[in-house]
Each structure stands twice: as C-alpha cells, then as structure tokens.
Amino acid sequence: MNTQLSAHQFKEVYEWLGINLSKLGCLMLDTEPIKTEYFEIMQDGITAYFPEYKAVNKERFWIDGYVGDKPHLTLLYGFMVEAKQLKNHIEKVLGGWNMETVTIADIGYFDSPYPDEQYYCIVAHIKVTDILLEGHRRLEFLPHINTFTGYKPHVTIAYIVKDEVIRDRLITHLKSELVGKELKINGLNYGGNK
C-alpha cells in the first residue's frame, strides 16, 4: 500500500489538541507566474475546458481555481503560528541560504484531503535539490507539525473539479508544455490566514 498519510486522517486528534490544521503557518517561495493556456486546450480539434474548483469552506481560501498566475513553492507548512510571527527566527535559521530558481520535474496531482471538498490539486512537482532540502530542513528547527509524510516540493497550478478524464487531459497537456521549465524565485512569502 502506497497511500500518502496525512494529519487530516487524524482530525479528531488535532481537534482534541485544539489545533486547526487549516490555520497553521506557512513559509513559501514566490515564483514567477506559470504561463499556460489553462482554460482552453485544443486536442484533436476539440477545445477542452477545465472547470476550476473553489473552496466551499472559506477557511480554505487557498483553494481558488487557477492559481498559477500567483504561484508559490511551500518551503514548510505547519508552523504552530503564522510565519509572520516567526519572521526574525526564520531569518536566523535561513541566514546565508538562498535560492534563485527551481525546475519543474513533472506534472501531477494530489487528491483533496478534505471529505467535504472534492477536487484535484494540479501541481508542478519541483526537482529536489540539495539547496532546496537544506532550506526546508533549516525551517524544521522551528516548532511545527508535519501535516503530510515526507517533503514533496511542488507549485500548485490549479484546483479543478474532481473528474479523472479532465485531470488526465490537463496533466498530459501541462507535461508537454512545462516539464524542464525553470521558474525564477521572486522572494519569501510569509503567508497569512485570511
């Protein structure tokens, strides 16, 4: 069995601890926009439309359809407080660390971890490099909860309705368009819970 474990599978544990998994802090690297013909892709002379999914639960503000125009790479999700509150500490643990670019290694998807939100999260998997792992590992010295097992660096491109045919068609197109593309890092993003 190769199922991705998630803290969301143990929701009652975190409720008992008084921890809202949707309100944890996050440090991200903003990247240049991912330019793609997202909404219309011609395939065999047929225009395919990819319906966006936007969160029903407004606490999940980040689930907002096409997000490739304002992309980020999560360096660490799960701080016990908003990353802005840890800014001085983050600057200390990341002192001397810098990334200028990342490379798209593949295109894939994640299933929604929320039973009440049925969508696919279409992502650009990022090539894992020593410098990227170092940044992530430095941040792990700060108080946090791992909400998923292992670090899977990715940039979210879009949240789409849960339809396997649409998902697979979109992924096939994006692979041909984006794999191997380098994305410029625009800076740190300390996030925030709207």
Task: Give the predicted meaning of each segment.
Residues 2-194:
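Histidine-dependent nucleotide/RNA phosphoesterase domain, centered on the 2H-phosphoesterase fold
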